[in-house]
Structure formats: structure tokens, C-alpha cells
Amino acid sequence: MAEPSVESSSPGGSATSDDHEFDPSADMLVHDFDDERTLEEEEMMEGETNFSSEIEDLAREGDMPIHELLSLYGYGSTVRLPEEDEEEEEEEEEGEDDEDADNDDNSGCSGENKEENIKDSSGQEDETQSSNDDPSQSVASQDAQEIIRPRRCKYFDTNSEVEEESEEDEDYIPSEDWKKEIMVGSMFQAEIPVGICRYKENEKVYENDDQLLWDPEYLPEDKVIIFLKDASRRTGDEKGVEAIPEGSHIKDNEQALYELVKCNFDTEEALRRLRFNVKAAREELSVWTEEECRNFEQGLKAYGKDFHLIQANKVRTRSVGECVAFYYMWKKSERYDFFAQQTRFGKKKYNLHPGVTDYMDRLLDESESAASSRAPSPPPTASNSSNSQSEKEDGTVSTTNQNGVSSNGPGEILNKEEVKVEGLHINGPTGGNKKPLHADMDTNGYETDNLTTDPKLAHMTARNENDFDEKSERPAKRRRVNSNGKESPGSSEFFQEAVSHGKFEELENTDD
């Protein structure tokens, strides 16, 4: 949309020039007055805008020549016309054919800069003259020159920067640190010391020739499956373990396949030989004796899963392959479960491999070992019981437990609500001179006369009696059975009888 002419002033122009800051008065601030008249005035001014003048300006500008229109908006003679630009571009293209691309870019850019500088100087002179007449036109012309003038030079500069970047991209070689190089070849082979290698360079590892055990490409798979089904079919003469059915799955009978290879893949001849030598075909793993099983388990304890050391030191009657096969059969049996419970064979992976972070198994092992190594508490000695008896005989006013540890002061005395009185429990042997429990003694075995003489404990006994009167209506607790199987009186009943008997004695004394 074309801008309105500078000469014609719009009706809203005067409103913008008269704008000022809104300064509320004291009455507005006191009464919290919100003046919304400014918004209403702006809406009214926007509604009163006359669009007919803008349409007339646009129609008049459409009939103007381009030179007058440019001078009207302040561009003057500095703006280049499209026709002149096309002519200069054609001349530049003809000159570029004779010279190199790099020189043409530099010279073209510098030449254009010179021409633009000349035109800028001439334009500035015209602007100074026109600025005296109309300052608004000069400001508009300067803004337009800043926008339009450097476009062509920036275009060529960006092209040169793109070319430089493309040259740098061609020379740039990215690092290949992210690639994983396969370490295959003579440079990656380990250097074995002289004393470790058992064989010489031209010496064979073993003297026997290789023997073909099975060729899967000679017979199709469906015929091989039919042959294995016929080989595993029972004749009805089997006894013992061999009479147990093996299921409907097809067993990979290596002995039968090897017989088929020896018969030159003749299925009938291979089946005839298998039926003739049934024991050799069915007993893939011979039975291990009890001594061999024990030696194998001892080898697992000593050497772990190093079957070479187990065969060399423990089970010399078997080969390494037989030891490996027996290990997988033995691991599925009940014998392995008993072995794992006794030795924790499958739970100490972190000892063999420190990198394993199985902390749960380690925590269980440590907790079990701590529980097993925990010693029982030592039994009480006779000195503890003798100390308690001597303290009772002396009649000292102190709260002493049955182990002989005393705590002085009324703050250490427990309340009757917290202590469950279940009779006298003394650890250790008791003497024959023990005083019987009667009405003049407290439930802990102390005489009430001695307790009342101490002023620190007098208020404690009175408070306990008041508490007992308030809570005497509670139901009695269940009786407890001691170690001899006899029923001992409950704490509440025992305590109730003792206190009630003591109150009865006090009433008799007051009557006297």
C-alpha cells in the first residue's frame, strides 16, 4: 500500500502531535478514579477517519511519472531505474567474459562502490539543497538511501562468501573418531613370548587327520528329520531308563547322524546299524560313579569352572568334553541344588568377577554371614544377683533392677502405667533368706516404710495411688505363663491386690 503524500495532512495527524502524558489529579487518586475517556476519544477518532482522501491520493499518484513520484517521496535522482540497471548488467557481463571470475568480482564490486560513492556525493548535495526547503523529504530520502543503496554490493559479497565457504568445504576433511576400526591384520596381532608357545611354527597341533562328522548339504532337511524320527522310534524291548518315552520333539541324535555319514548317507543301512548296536547309539553319556561326582564337585569348589584343571587334578578318568557335558546335566539335577545350598556356588559371582554390580546378592550374603557369626548374649553371673540381694537387705532407697545396675534420683523411676509388674524375676540363684511379700512391702520388693521416709519418693507413691483409683475400672489383663508352664498372675490383678490390701491396713490405723 502506498504511503500518503507528505503535502496532504491526514485528520489524525494533529492528534498524534498533541499527545502528552496523562497526569491524574489528587481527586482521582483519592477516589480511585479510572478515566476511560481517552479510550473512547481514540475510538471516535478512528471511526471519523476519512478514507476518501487516501483513495484520491492513490489515484493521483498512479497517474504521476516515475521521476515525479520518486521526488515526491524524497528519493530524488539517486535511485537507479530498472532500465539503467539492466543496461549496466549487460555491459558488465560482456566485460566478465574477457577476464577471470575472481578479478571480475573484485573489480565489479570496487567499480560499483566508486560509482555509488560518486552518486552518493551528488545525492548528498541535492539533499542538502532540498533539506533547506523540506526537512521531512530529506529524512525520508536518507532512510530510503540506506535501505536501497547497498543491495547490489551485498549480493556480490554474499556470493563471494559462499564461494569461499565452498572452497573451504572441499579442503576440509572431517575427523573419523566416531568410526570403529576393525582390528584385523598383522599389525593387531599379539606378540607371544618365546616360552609360552607349546608348538613350533611348522609343527601340527595334533597328528591325526580331520574327520568329517556331518555334512548338511548332502541330504535335504525333510529326509534328515524322517531319519531321526525312525532312529528314535522304540522297538518295545527297552528296559529301565531307556523305556521312558522321550516326547514328540525331534532329538538331535549326533550318533545317528554320524552313522549316516559313515554309511554314505544311506538311511536304511544306517538304521540297520543303529538297531544292531542299540547301546552305543543310546548311551551318549556314560553313567558317572559316586566317587567321580564327588571329585567333580570338589574340583568346582577349588578351581571354579576351569574344566581343564578339574580333569587334570580331580577327574582323570574322564575327558574335558565329558566334564563339560556332565556339568550341564549335573546343574539341572537335585544334586546341584544341595551343592549350591552348602557352598553358595552360584551366588559369589562378584568374587570371581569384580566388575559385576549385583549388590542385592552381596547384601543377602553379608546379612546371612552376619547373622550366623553373631554370638549369643552371655548369661548373667552370680555377682549380679548377690548385689541385688545385698542392696535389698541394706534397705537403701534407690531404684535397682534385677541385674544390679542402679539409677539414683526420682527422674529415673518409671511410672506404674509404664512398668508391667509381673512378680519378682531374679536372674541367678536366690538365697534362702529372702523376705516374703506382704502388705507392708511394695510390688518391687521394697518396704513401704522405707519408701515413705524419703521425701523425694513420698509424692511419687501418692500420685501413683491416685492414678490407680482413676484407672481401677479397666479390665484385667490376660494371665501369662512362666517358663515352668505354670500360670502366673497378671500384672493388673497382682497390683490391685497389693494396693487394696495396703489401703485396708491404712484404714485400720486411722480408726485406732
Swiss-Prot record:
SMART domains: ELM2, SANT
Biased composition (Polar residues): 129-144, 396-409, 482-494
Main subcellular location: nucleus
Presence of keyword Zinc: no
Keywords: Isopeptide bond, Nucleus, Phosphoprotein, Repressor, Transcription, Transcription regulation, Ubl conjugation
Compositionally biased tracts (Low complexity): 1-16
Chain ranges of the SANT domain: 283-335
Region feature (Disordered): 1-63, 75-173, 366-512
Biased composition (Acidic residues): 37-46, 83-105, 160-173
Location of the region described as Interaction with HDAC1 in the Swiss-Prot/TrEMBL record: 180-284
Residues the record lists as Phosphotyrosine modifications: Y155
Residue ranges with Basic and acidic residues bias: 17-36, 414-423, 462-475
Swiss-Prot/TrEMBL GO biological process terms: chromatin remodeling; negative regulation of transcription by RNA polymerase II; regulation of DNA-templated transcription
A GO molecular-function descriptor: transcription corepressor activity
Keyword Nucleus appears in the UniProt entry: yes
Entry's localization field: Nucleus
InterPro entries, per the entry: ELM2_dom, Homeodomain-like_sf, MIER/MTA, MIER1/3_C, SANT/Myb, SANT_dom
Role this protein plays: Transcriptional repressor regulating the expression of a number of genes including SP1 target genes. Probably functions through recruitment of HDAC1 a histone deacetylase involved in chromatin silencing.
Quaternary structure and partners: Interacts with HDAC1. Part of a complex containing at least CDYL, MIER1, MIER2, HDAC1 and HDAC2.
PANTHER family: MESODERM INDUCTION EARLY RESPONSE PROTEIN 1 (PTHR10865:SF24), METASTASIS-ASSOCIATED PROTEIN AND MESODERM INDUCTION EARLY RESPONSE PROTEIN (PTHR10865)
Protein's name according to its UniProt entry: Mesoderm induction early response protein 1
Organism whose genome encodes this protein: Pongo abelii
